[in-house]
Amino acid sequence: MNKINAAITAVGAYLPEDVITNDDLEKMVDTNDEWIMTRVGIKERRILRDKNKGASYLAIRAAQDLFDRHGIDPKSIDGLILATNSSDYHFPSTASIVAHEIGCGDIFSFDMQAACPTFIYALEVGANFIRSGRYSKILVIATEKMTAFTDYTDRATCPLFGDGAGCVLLEATEEEVGVMDAVLHSNGIGKDHLIMKAGGSACPATHETVDNRWHYVYQEGQVVFKHAVVDMCNSCVEIMERNNLSHDDITWVVPHQANLRIIDAVARRMGVPYEKVMVNIERYGNTSSATIPICLWEWEHKLKKGDVLVMTSFGAGFTWGAVYVKWAYDGSTVR
């Protein structure tokens, strides 16, 4: 039997229409456009303002975009993996809601949560389902309503986050394309540096936790920045060395869009010219696990069959890693 690979054969995304600019934030907290642009490189971010709609709504819209533009029948999907750090509820899973709403029938579906790298974790998990030979099509969706957990009185974190969703379809192939390798790491030393302190079983919601604003994202920015630069760079070098890839072999670097200075550092360490790096943080901010698939969606028409992509991310925990992908189709042919 020939080796089965897991190819990305379609991408989709959805970004809410409403925008929060740096000028808008200047009216809420003590900040300004120059301060935000200098430190993180974000000009604006999208927000899903409807309080009755959660991450599932964004995921549904992203999946529908993929189905519509690529002519995919939802009933052909074997399983759905949903990457999110902002699920609709603790239970039921957001994946089960999405699978039902997009018309996939009674397929298996589950949520994954590994902070901002959740998408690359989910991509490797989905690829292994395909490699097992038991499944032909796995839909991987990353969806985040991060603004629901953003404290708009905190000048350090409120400029960072935006809402959005992106997705990819993994399909079985015998060609030498698809998810070729992944390096995934975690280390709990960073637990207290990037955290939502309350709402889980270790610290259930009380009047005190609400009053202390512990249900919003808390981040020690300088600590997180230093670890992100080192770990994202090291994971990229690790996957390049494991697969004998030089900087000349790489067509595109797809970094997590958390901070423009981190992205710059990764590109320099890899020796890749900046024109090969996907960057859209200025317009969308940090959509957590959704940043990488949103980049793939936005660059789809530039991607060609055989292109070599290295995706890398870092997040709470700490968690980090990189994925090596050979692109499976010419994006210019997609409507």
Curated annotation (Swiss-Prot):
It catalyses: malonyl-[ACP] + acetyl-CoA + H(+) = 3-oxobutanoyl-[ACP] + CO2 + CoA. The active site is at 116, 256, 286. The keyword Cytoplasm applies. It is found in: Cytoplasm. The keyword Lipid biosynthesis applies. One of its GO terms (molecular function) is 3-oxoacyl-[acyl-carrier-protein] synthase activity. Its EC number is 2.3.1.180. One of its GO terms (cellular component) is cytoplasm. Pathway: Lipid metabolism; fatty acid biosynthesis. Residues 257-261 are annotated as: ACP-binding. It holds the Pfam family ACP_syn_III. It is an enzyme of class 2 (transferase). Keywords: Acyltransferase, Cytoplasm, Fatty acid biosynthesis, Fatty acid metabolism, Lipid biosynthesis, Lipid metabolism, Multifunctional enzyme, Transferase. GO terms for biological process: fatty acid biosynthetic process; secondary metabolite biosynthetic process. Belongs to the thiolase-like superfamily. FabH family. Homodimer. Catalyzes the condensation reaction of fatty acid synthesis by the addition to an acyl acceptor of two carbons from malonyl-ACP. Catalyzes the first condensation reaction which initiates fatty acid synthesis and may therefore play a role in governing the total rate of fatty acid production. Possesses both acetoacetyl-ACP synthase and acetyl transacylase activities. Its substrate specificity determines the biosynthesis of branched-chain and/or straight-chain of fatty acids. The last Arg residue of the ACP-binding site is essential for the weak association between ACP/AcpP and FabH. This is Beta-ketoacyl-[acyl-carrier-protein] synthase III.
